[in-house]
UniProtKB/Swiss-Prot annotation:
One of its GO terms (molecular function) is 5'-3' RNA exonuclease activity. Its EC number is 3.1.13.-. This is 5'-3' exoribonuclease 2. It comes from Chaetomium globosum (strain ATCC 6205 / CBS 148.51 / DSM 1962 / NBRC 6347 / NRRL 1970) (Soil fungus). The gene is RAT1. A zinc finger (CCHC-type) spans 270-287. Residues 542-564, 932-943 have a biased composition (Low complexity). GO terms for biological process: DNA-templated transcription termination; mRNA processing; nuclear-transcribed mRNA catabolic process; positive regulation of chromosome segregation; rapid tRNA decay; rRNA processing. It is found in: Nucleus. Residues 414-462, 508-565, 869-907, 930-1039 are annotated as: Disordered. Interacts with RAI1; the interaction is direct, stabilizes RAT1 protein structure and may stimulate its exoribonuclease activity. The interaction also stimulates RAI1 pyrophosphohydrolase activity, probably by recruiting it to mRNA substrates. It holds the Pfam family XRN_N. The lineage of its organism: Eukaryota, Fungi, Dikarya, Ascomycota, Pezizomycotina. Possesses 5'->3' exoribonuclease activity. Required for the processing of nuclear mRNA and rRNA precursors. May promote the termination of transcription by RNA polymerase II. Essential for vegetative cell growth and chromosome segregation. Keywords: Coiled coil, Exonuclease, Hydrolase, Metal-binding, mRNA processing, Nuclease, Nucleus, rRNA processing, Transcription, Transcription regulation, Transcription termination, Zinc, Zinc-finger.
Length: 1039
C-alpha cells in the first residue's frame, strides 16, 4: 500500500501486534551432510495453520537483486533462489490444508497502471544514470591504474543489474517463473511428506489482478461458501503494507501477516551493488576485484539469514476495539463496521491509486487526526461511514469538513517543524566545523615537539616541521560517489552553481582561518528506491520515515539542506496557497473554483473505487484518477449530491499493459514488433514514451519522493496503434498475450480429492469437462475444476530450465487441473461468521492504559494545537471540535473551558481539567457521550467493551441488559486519551424499553456541555428517571 512507513507506524503504535517467528533450521552435520527440516512435526510457534498465501512479488524482488550477497548471474540461478526462499517460508508456517501462490501481479486495473508506469519509468531512468556512473568509474579507474592494473579486466567487476521491469505480466521472464514454480510445487508434492495432503493453487501472471487482491478474492470466495470453517487459520506472506489492511477487510480474526524483519541489523553496511563485495556500499566503491577466501572462495562466510516476524491481525483488532469504541451511541455499536471506517480513513493518507491529501502525512499523525474527527462526528452522523465496501458520501463529508478546519494550521505547523529541523542541522554543522578548525590548529605541525630550540635556518623548514617525501603522499582514492557528485554538479543549473560558488566563497572568507584548505564535502547519494521495484521502494520509505522521526539529529545535508533543493513556490504555509497550488500544479486559473470541485469529485470517486476494490473486488478495470495531484480538504463540498457508479469495463491484455507501463529503455521485455511504436519519430504514440520527464519534488527534499509528471496513457490511441502490428506476433508471443487460469495441484496421497478428479477426468467414463468440488472430500475447498487440455497424468515431471539444476521425476504422482473460484450473488459482508471462536485476548489492562495514554490528544497534536474553538465568543475556549453542524451555545464546563452544543441533542461541551466538568476522566475534555458502566461478561475484564451476543470479548453488538441494582459509573472513566466520556447513574427498573438515555448529570462537561456559561445540557435527550430518593432537579434540564 502506498503509505510510506505504515508498517513501522503500526508496530510502534500497537507494539503487541508484532512477534518474532520461531524458525527451525536445517542441521549441518560434521561431515557436511544437511538434515532438512521435518515440516511434518508440530509448528514450533505453538499454533498450527491451515492456509498459507504467498505474494511472490515479495520473494522474486529480493531474490533477483538481494542486499546481502551478489545478484544471481542468470535466470536459472534466480529460480533456484526463489525455490530456497519459498521453501523456507513454507517450513516456517507449515500449512496443513492449502498453499496459494500468487506468482506475480497479473494485468492490473487501469487505476494501478498509472502508478506502475511512474515506478517503471523512474526505475529505467535511475538504471540509465547508474550505468553511466559505472562506465565513468571504469574509465577513471583504468586511467588511474594504467599499467599497474591487475591481470583480470576491471569490466568483470562491474555487472549489469537485472532489469526489475521484467517482473511485469507478458514478459518472457514471467513465463519462466510460472513454469519453474509449477515444476517445483509438483516436485515437492512428489518428494516431501509435509506436502502430501496439501492442496496447491498457483495463480500466475496470465490471470488478471494484483497478486494480493487475487488472494483476497479467494478468501472472500471461500468465506461465502456455506461449508467454510470460520475458524480457518490464515497466514499471508508479503512485504506490502496493504496486506494488513486487506487482512482486516476479510473480517477473519484468525489471520496473520508474515514478513521479513526489514529492520534487522539496519545499521550494518550492505553489500556493494557494483562489485559484489562486503564492507562498503556503492558510494565508496573503488572498483577493486574481490579477494577470494580460499582457492575457490569456499571459505567466504555467509551472512546470517534475516529473521521473520508475525503481524497478528487479531491483536490489531483488539487495539482498534479500544481506540475506536465510543460508548452510548444513538445507534448500535459494531466493531466490524468501525474497523472498515478505519481502513477507509487510512486510504486518505496513502494508497497505490490516489495521491494522498496534502494535509495528511503519516509522520504527522495523519491517521490519528482522522480518527479524532471520526470520533467527534460518529454520534451526529447517524451511522458509520462505510458499509460492506460502499461509502456513505453524506457521512464522508463530515470527515473531510473536519479535516478542512485544521488544514491551514497543519501546513503552518509543518513549516515550523521543517524550519526547526533545518536550523538544528545548520547549528550542528557549524559546531562540527568549528570543532574541526580548533582541532586542526591544535594538531598543527608547527606546534609539534622535537627539533632544536631557537630560530630556524634561513633556507630551511620551520623547527619541528615533519617532512615527508612527495611520492609518499597518497593520491586521493577514486570512488563511485565522486563520480556521482561530479555528475550532480554538472547537471546543476548555471544559477544554482553560481549561487553555490558565491556562498562557498563567502563562507571561506568569513569562517575559515587563514591557511586552512577547503575541504570537499560529499553529500550522501542515495539510490532512488524506484530502481529497486515496488516492494523495495516501500521498505526504503519505511526506513527513511524511521530515521526522520526518531533521529532527526543525524540527517545529512542531502536530506535537509534547503540550499541545494528547489524553491517551494507554492508555500502552503502562507496565505493564498490554494490559488498558487492550482495555478502551478494544475495550470488553471486560480479563480476557477468549479475546477477545484471537479478534481475533488474525481478524488471521491477514487476513494469509493479503492474501498470497493479492497472489500468486494475490482469495481471497474478502466477507471483511473486523471490528475497527478490531490485536492485540498476544503475543496470537497456537497458530496451527498454525488451519484457514483462504475462499469466493469474491459480487462487489458498483457502486451497492452506492457506498452502502457514500460519505458522504451525496457522494450527488450516487449515483443519486437512493437518496438518501433516506442522509438520511431513517425510513431503515433511516441509521446507516451518520453526519455526525459520532469520530477516535481512537490515540497519534498529527495528526488525519489517527487512526482513523475508523465503523460497519461490514452487507451484508444494505444490500442489503435497496436492493432497495426498485432498480426506480426509469433505463436509464442500470442500465447503469452492470452489470459490464463489458476491451476490446482494435488498429490495422490490426498484422500478423496485425488479420486474425485481422477474419476471425473481420467477414467473410462469422463462424463463432464468440469465439476464442482465437494468441500467434505476436498478438505474444505470450494470451487470448480476443469481438465487441462493436453495434460496427461502419471507421466514424467521434467525440469523446465536448461542446466538441469533440479532432477526430473520419472513417475509424477501429482495431478494438475484448472481451478475456478466459487462465485456468489451475495456480497462480502463485514461481519463475523457464525460459529467463530475468537482468539484468546492478548491485551491486558496495562496495554489498554498504554493505548489510551498514547492516544491523549492524538490527532490534535499536529495542526490541531493550538487551534481554538472560536464559537464560544469571548471565553478562553478549547481545542477545536471537529464535529459538523453549526454552533449552538457555549459555556464553560467545569473550569470554564468552553465548548458548543450540537444540534442533534448530542452534547459536545468541553469540560475542564478535573472538577465538576472533568467529564469523568479527570482531565482532557468531556464529549458528553454519557457513558454508563456495563457489567463484565464472564471471562471479561471490566474495562473491556461489552461483547455482542455469542462472541465474547469484542464490543460489536448491542450491550447486554443493565444489572438489577443501580450502578454509578463514569462510563469509560479515562475516556479515550483522557477525553472523559461522561457517566450517568441509572436503575434497571426505571428505564423504559429501548436504549438507556444518553447524557447524564455527572459527565460530559457538567452537565454534558457546560452549565456555567448558559450552554445547553448535553447528551441525547431521552427520557430520564432518577434513582429512588434522588431529585429530578439534579438533571439540570435545559432552560
Amino acid at each position: 500500500m502506498g503509505i510510506p512507513a505504515a508498517f513501522r507506524w503500526l508496530s510502534t503504535k500497537y507494539p503487541k501486534i508484532i512477534s518474532p517467528v520461531v524458525e527451525e533450521k536445517a542441521l549441518v552435520m560434521e561431515d557436511g551432510t544437511v538434515v532438512p527440516v521435518d515440516a511434518t512435526q508440530p509448528n514450533p510457534n505453538g499454533e498450527e495453520f491451515d492456509n498459507l498465501y504467498l505474494d511472490m512479488n515479495g520473494i522474486v524482488h529480493p531474490c533477483s537483486h538481494p542486499e546481502d550477497r551478489p545478484a544471481p548471474s542468470d535466470e536459472e540461478e534466480m529460480m533456484v533462489e526463489v525455490f530456497k526462499y519459498t521453501e523456507r517460508v513454507v517450513n516456517m508456517v507449515r500449512p496443513r490444508k492449502l498453499l496459494m501462490i500468487a506468482v506475480a501481479d497479473g494485468v492490473a486495473p487501469r487505476a494501478k497502471m498509472n502508478q506502475q508506469r511512474s515506478r517503471r519509468f523512474r526505475a529505467a531512468q535511475d538504471a540509465k544514470e547508474k550505468e553511466e556512473d559505472k562506465q565513468q568509474l571504469l574509465k577513471m579507474l583504468q586511467k588511474e591504474k594504467g599499467s599497474t592494473a591487475k591481470e583480470e579486466p576491471i569490466e568483470t567487476v562491474v555487472k549489469k543489474a537485472f532489469d526489475s521491469n521484467s517482473i511485469t505480466p507478458g514478459t518472457p521472464f514471467m513465463d519462466i517463473l510460472a513454469a519453474s514454480l509449477r515444476y517445483w510445487c509438483a516436485y515437492k508434492l512428489n518428494t516431501d511428506p509435509a506436502w502430501a495432503k496439501m492442496k496447491v493453487i498457483i495463480s500466475d501472471a496470465t490471470v488478471p489482478g494484483e497478486g494480493e487482491h487475487k488472494i483476497m478474492e479467494f478468501v472472500r470466495s471461500q468465506r461465502n461458501s456455506p461449508e467454510h470453517d470460520p475458524n480457518t487459520r490464515h497466514v499471508i506472506y508479503g512485504l506490502d503494507a496493504d496486506l494488513i489492511m486487506l487482512g482486516l477487510a476479510t473480517h477473519e480474526p484468525h489471520f496473520r501477516v508474515l514478513r521479513e524483519d526489514v529492520f534487522f541489523q539496519q545499521g550494518k553496511a550492505r553489500m556493494c551493488k557494483l562489485c559484489g563485495q562486503k564492507g562498503h556500499d556503492e558510494r565508496n566503491c573503488r572498483g577493486e576485484a574481490k579477494e577470494k577466501a580460499g582457492e575457490f572462495d569456499e571459505k567466504d562466510k555467509a551472512e546470517p539469514l534475516k529473521p521473520f516476524i508475525w503481524l497478528h491481525v487479531s491483536i490489531l483488532r483488539e487495539y482498534l476495539a479500544i481506540e475506536l469504541n465510543i460508548p452510548n451511541l444513538p445507534f448500535r455499536w459494531d466493531l466490524e463496521r468501525a474497523i472498515d471506517d478505519w481502513v477507509f480513513m487510512c486510504f486518505f493518507v496513502g494508497n497505490d491509486f490516489l495521491p494522498h491529501l496534502p494535509a495528511l502525512e503519516i509522520r504527522e499523525n495523519g491517521i490519528e487526526t482522522l480518527m479524532a474527527i471520526w470520533k467527534d462526528n460518529l454520534p451526529v452522523m447517524g451511522g458509520y461511514v462505510t458499509k460492506d465496501g460502499h461509502v456513505d458520501l453524506d457521512r464522508a463529508q463530515y470527515i473531510l469538513s473536519g479535516l478542512a478546519k485544521q488544514e491551514d494550521s497543519i501546513f503552518r505547523r509543518r513549516k515550523e517543524t521543517e524550519d526547526r529541523r533545518e536550523a538544528g542541522f545548520k547549528r550542528r554543522k557549524l559546531n562540527n566545523q568549528q570543532g574541526n578548525n580548533r582541532g586542526g590548529a591544535h594538531d598543527s605541525p608547527l606546534s609539534g615537539r622535537g627539533g632544536r630550540k631557537g630560530a630556524p635556518e634561513a633556507n630551511g623548514p620551520p623547527v619541528g616541521m615533519n617532512l615527508f617525501p612527495v611520492a609518499s603522499i597518497p593520491k586521493p582514492v577514486i570512488t563511485h560517489d565522486m563520480v556521482v557528485n561530479r555528475a550532480n554538479v554538472a547537471n546543476k543549473s548555471a544559477a544554482s552553481v553560481l549561487k553555490s560558488q558565491i556562498q562557498s566563497l563567502v563562507a571561506q572568507t568569513q569562517e575559515k582561518p587563514e591557511g586552512d584548505e577547503p575541504k570537499e564535502e560529499n553529500p550522501e547519494a542515495k539510490t532512488p528506491p524506484s530502481a529497486l521495484g515496488k516492494r523495495k521502494a516501500e521498505l526504503i520509505e519505511e526506513g527513511t520515515a524511521t530515521a526522520s522521526d526518531a533521529a532527526s539529529d543525524t540527517e545529512t545535508p542531502a536530506t535537509t539542506s534547503s540550499e541545494e533543493g528547489p524553491i517551494d513556490t507554492v508555500r502552503l504555509w502562507e496565505e493564498g496557497y490554494a490559488d498558487r497550488y492550482y495555478e502551478q500544479k494544475f495550470k488553471v486559473d486560480a479563480k476557477d473554483i468549479a475546477f477545484r470541485h471537479k478534481v475533488a469529485r474525481a478524488y471521491v470517486e477514487g476513494l469509493a473505487w479503492v474501498l470497493m476494490y479492497y472489500f468486494q473486488g475490482c469495481p471497474s478495470w478502466e477507471w483511473f484518477y486523471p490528475y497527478h495531484y490531490a485536492p485540498f480538504a476544503a475543496d470537497f463540498v456537497d458530496l451527498g449530491k454525488m451519484k457514483i457508479s462504475f462499469e466493469k469495463g474491459r480487462i487489458s491484455r498483457p502486451f497492452e499493459q506492457l506498452m502502457s507501463v514500460l519505458p522504451a529503455a525496457s522494450r527488450h521485455a516487449i515483443p519486437e514488433v512493437f518496438h518501433d511504436l516506442m522509438t520511431q519519430e513517425d510513431s503515433p504514440i511516441l509521446d507516451f514514451y518520453p526519455e526525459d520527464f520532469e520530477i516535481d519534488l512537490n515540497g519534498k527534499k529527495m528526488s525519489w519522493q517527487g512526482i513523475a509528471l508523465l503523460p497519461f496513457i490514452e487507451m484508444p490511441r494505444l490500442l489503435d496503434a497496436m492493432k497495426t502490428k498485432s498480426h506480426l506476433l509469433s505463436a509464442e508471443d500470442k500465447a503469452r498475450n492470452a489470459p490464463g487460469h489458476d491451476v490446482l495441484l494435488i498429490s495422490d496421497s490426498h484422500p478423496g480429492l485425488y479420486e474425485d478428479i481422477s474419476s471425473h477426468f481420467y477414467s473410462k467414463k469422463q462424463a463432464v469437462p468440469e465439476f464442482k468440488l465437494d468441500p467434505k472430500r476436498s478438505d474444505g475447498l470450494s470451487g470448480k475444476v476443469r481438465k487441462i487440455e493436453g495434460y496427461v497424468p502419471h507421466g514424467s515431471l521434467v525440469y523446465p530450465l536448461e542446466r538441469n539444476t533440479m532432477p526430473d521425476v520419472d513417475y509424477d504422482r501429482s495431478m494438475s487441473v484448472n481451478y475456478d473460484m466459487p462465485t456468489s450473488s451475495h456480497i462480502h459482508k463485514s461481519m463475523l461468521l457464525r460459529g467463530l471462536k475468537m482468539p484468546t485476548p492478548a491485551l491486558d489492562r496495562s496495554d489498554v492504559d498504554f493505548v489510551r495514554s498514547k492516544g491523549r490528544g492524538a490527532g490534535r497534536s499536529f495542526g490541531g494545537v493550538p487551534l481554538r474553538n472560536n464559537y464560544n465568543g469571548g471565553g478562553r475556549g478549547d481545542r477545536i471540535n471537529y464535529a459538523g453542524g453549526p454552533p449552538r451555545g457555549g459555556g464553560g464546563g467545569g473550569r470554564g473551558r468552553g465548548g458548543y452544543q450540537q444540534d442533534r441533542g448530542y452534547g459536545n461541551g468541553y469540560g475542564g481539567g478535573g472538577g465538576s466538568g472533568g467529564g469523568g476522566g479527570g482531565g482532557g475534555y468531556g464529549n458528553g457521550y454519557g457513558g454508563y458502566q456495563q457489567p463484565a461478561a464472564p471471562g471479561q475484564q471490566s474495562w473491556q467493551p461489552p461483547p455482542p451476543p455469542g462472541y465474547p470479548g469484542f464490543g460489536v453488538g448491542v450491550p447486554p441488559p443493565p444489572p438489577p441494582a443501580h450502578a454509578s459509573g463514569g462510563g469509560y472513566n479515562q475516556g479515550y486519551g483522557n477525553q472523559g466520556y461522561g457517566g450517568q447513574n441509572y436503575r434497571n427498573d426505571r428505564y423504559p424499553p429501548g436504549p438507556p438515555p444518553h447524557g447524564g448529570y455527572q459527565g460530559g462537561g457538567y452537565p454534558g456541555g457546560g452549565y456555567q456559561g448558559g450552554g445547553h445540557q448535553g447528551g441525547y435527550q431521552g427520557q430520564y428517571h432518577p434513582p429512588h430518593g434522588q431529585s429530578q432537579d439534579r438533571r439540570h434540564d435545559n432552560s
